[in-house]
Swiss-Prot record:
Entries under Pfam families matching the protein: BATS (PF06968), Radical_SAM (PF04055)
Disulfide bonds, paired cysteine numbers: none
Alphabetized CDD domains for the sequence: Radical_SAM (cd01335)
Keyword line: 2Fe-2S, 4Fe-4S, Biotin biosynthesis, Iron, Iron-sulfur, Metal-binding, S-adenosyl-L-methionine, Transferase
Record protein name field: Biotin synthase
Length: 350
């Protein structure tokens, strides 16, 4: 299969409607052709500036437009961010992502952001930031400081977008991605499933991503985390099989990209996550929180990787060079000793 940039919505919908087993099989074949089998890349995400965002994204608990339990916090001190990065590296992450709840970064904040990037890079970690919209000049500054990835999601299809966000346009998002690419950085861009969009909208999101001049190097696929106080707190649950199908579709359409299981993974049981990996997911966020929403902790992830025979880069980069099977056995023993460990997941397949 060739790498394409000319997908149509109708074509993607036909792909989505394939028999489940056929679709997963096709995705796994593509995955093994373009990606390393049985391998998952792990990243850590830190909120470096939380809450009071002026945007009105209906899914987001950090928006100043909604009453949620998220407290407003100033931009973190550089040293505090670097301390968190050290902990992430020691826990096994190979990429450190920093997110700020802004419409766009102010010029007064740029020196601090650049110092964060440089400090994290010195630790040998890949760096990623998500700061909202950025100008071409800001993209150049971030790139010069050593930023590897910039995250800016498209969220949904152009047609459904206005139902979710009104404070920035779809073109604003595409312009930011262009600035990132022109500055020589890698793109991390995906969307959110479960906001009330149609199957056609889901297909449209992936068409937008796959038809970019160059595919995003990383494609996070989020399942909506419903937060009390946001307009989407009562949204319908996403059918697990529909979500797994979308992972497969992303893998087939963007074979060279990393497909990341992102928000919503806390509500997926082990079987659902395993099927997502089979469908082509090969990256996860690692740690107990994604910005302000829950995420499976590191030990739980390592136990699942052991069950599946999945390798993560984090094992090979442990400072003491512990053999992978020894590390996984120790983690599994710790997790097995916990009470009510099965309560970490609800039965998402029902």
């Amino acid at each position: 299969m060739e790498v394409r940039h000319n997908w149509t919505v109708a074509e993607v919908q036909t792909l989505m409607d394939k028999p489940f087993m056929d679709l997963i099989f096709e995705a796994q074949l593509v995955h093994r052709k373009y990606q390393q089998a049985n391998h998952v890349q792990v990243s850590t995400l830190l909120s470096i500036k939380t809450g009071a965002c002026p945007e009105d994204c209906k899914y987001c608990p950090q928006s100043a437009h909604y009453r949620t339990d998220v407290d407003r916090e100033r931009l973190m001190e550089v040293e505090s961010v670097l301390d968190a990065a050290k902990k992430a590296k020691n826990s096994g992450s190979t990429r450190f992502c920093m997110g700020a709840a802004w419409k766009n970064p102010k010029e007064r904040d740029m020196p601090y952001l650049l110092d964060m990037i440089k400090g994290v890079k010195e630790m040998g970690l890949e760096t990623c930031m998500t700061l909202g919209m950025i100008t071409a000049d800001q993209a150049g500054e971030l790139s010069e400081a050593g930023l590897d990835y910039y995250n800016h999601n498209l969220d949904t299809s152009p047609e459904f977008y206005g139902n979710i966000i009104t404070t920035r346009t779809y073109q604003d998002r595409l312009d930011t991605l262009s600035h990132v690419r022109d500055a020589g950085m890698k793109i991390c861009s995906g969307g959110i499933i479960g906001m009330g969009e149609s199957a056609s909208d889901r297909a449209g999101l992936f068409v937008e991503l796959a038809n970019l001049p160059q595919h995003p190097e990383s494609v996070p696929v989020n399942m909506l985390v419903k937060v009390k106080g946001t307009p989407l707190e009562d949204a319908e649950d996403v059918d697990p099989f529909d979500f797994i199908r979308l992972i497969a579709v992303a893998r087939i359409m963007m074979p060279e990209s990393a497909v990341r299981l992102s928000a919503g993974r806390e509500s997926m049981n082990e079987q659902m996550q395993a099927l997502c990996f089979m469908a082509g997911a090969n990256s996860v966020f690692y740690g107990c929180k994604l910005l302000t929403t829950p995420n499976p902790d590191e030990d739980t992830d390592m136990q699942l990787f052991k069950k599946l025979g999945v390798n993560s880069e984090q094992v090979a980069q442990k400072p003491d060079q512990i053999q992978e099977h020894e590390l996984l056995d120790r983690v599994a023993e710790r997790v097995a000793a916990r009470p009510n460990k099965d309560d970490l997941f609800y039965e998402a397949s029902v």
